[in-house]
Amino acid sequence: MAVTMDGVMGHLHHASGSTGVVFCSPWGFDALCTVKFHRLVADDLARRGFPSIRFDYPGEGDSLPVEEGATFATWVNAAVRAAAELRRRTGCTQILYYGMGIGATVALQAGRQDDKVAGYMLAASALSGRRYLREVALREKVIEDGIGIDFGYSPGSTVLASFIMDPRLAADLKAVTVAVDTVSPNLPVLVLARPENAADRDLAEALGAAGASVTCTDFTGYGAMLDGVVTSPMPMALIETIGDWFSRAIPAEAVSRPSDAVEAEPMMLSTTSFREQAEIVDTRLFGVLCQPASGTESAVIILLNMAYAPHNGWGNIWVDTARTLAHQGIATFRVDLSNI
């Protein structure tokens, strides 16, 4: 179920349990490659009684752009807002924050602001913004050297596989770091460690030394998942392992759904030039209809993606295209193909 909240697009997975899960995704290309994985994890958790919400950071994916540029605080505030929306719509009372990549830092910072944090799941964590930016730059250099093309990005840009980070956010990240010894003692934490990455296992040890109840497991399939979206290898055994950990470590008592949780609320995002609404086609396909703000359109274009790329497209190309066309009076429908 799609939801909107202060210009942010999210996806809610209903369940009746008292513990909800907020998904804090990685950035850019990594987020593109893990949409399906996170959907499958959220679906499995919902079957086990854990409601959850996935969302696009402000200025990313389907969420509205930030007028003066996104900051790291903007992202953390979006995670806090997503937790409030999850509580409002499902009645869950405590939140476990899941973060992957730089999203692990978002998750930890959001959890610090939640007096009913239930725990954390941290996957392929990047807890130093400066180190993360260096890794992004190295990955992009490998891509550009491999294909021998100069894309003409502005000097100093933070880019990965056609995704360009907001300069204000990149500047913010240089000063962002998280000290794990501030995690509350006895909180359950699941660490998904990349094979042959000592930093992930060091993180698990540091969390344990700080008093957290830590489980560390291999992030099997990590490399294949982030290799692109031409194929869609999913680590189904890992998804089962994650679900089993939740069932063991987190209470899943049922709660009553709040009376103001109205599923018929319109999922609308709008600006002075366009308005967008999430649509479900034949109960199977998800897409976003983008129309001119005037309500008058001269044509409708269907935007389809290649392989397993979600509807926002590489570098958010279809989101940008749809909103540009809406300004010119043309409506579009960008859609996820089956099994995304």
Predicted regions mapped to residue ranges:
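Terminal, non-globular segments
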Residues: 1-11, 46, 53-55, 198, ...
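N-terminal cap/lid segment of alpha/beta-hydrolase-fold proteins
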Residues: 1-19, 244, 248-299
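The alpha/beta-hydrolase serine catalytic core
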Residues: 5, 114-243, 252-253, 259-264, ...
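Short, surface-exposed "cap/lid" segments of acyl-processing enzymes
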Residues: 15-56, 292-337
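Short glycine-enriched, charge-decorated loop/helix-capping segments at active-site entrances
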Residues: 37-38, 66-71, 231-232, 317-318
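Catalytic nucleophile-loop/oxyanion-hole region of alpha/beta-hydrolase
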Residues: 60-94, 338-340
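Gly/Ala-rich beta-loop-alpha elbow adjacent to hydrolase catalytic centers
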Residues: 98-107, 124
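Active-site signature of alpha/beta-hydrolase-fold catalytic machinery across serine-
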Residues: 109-113
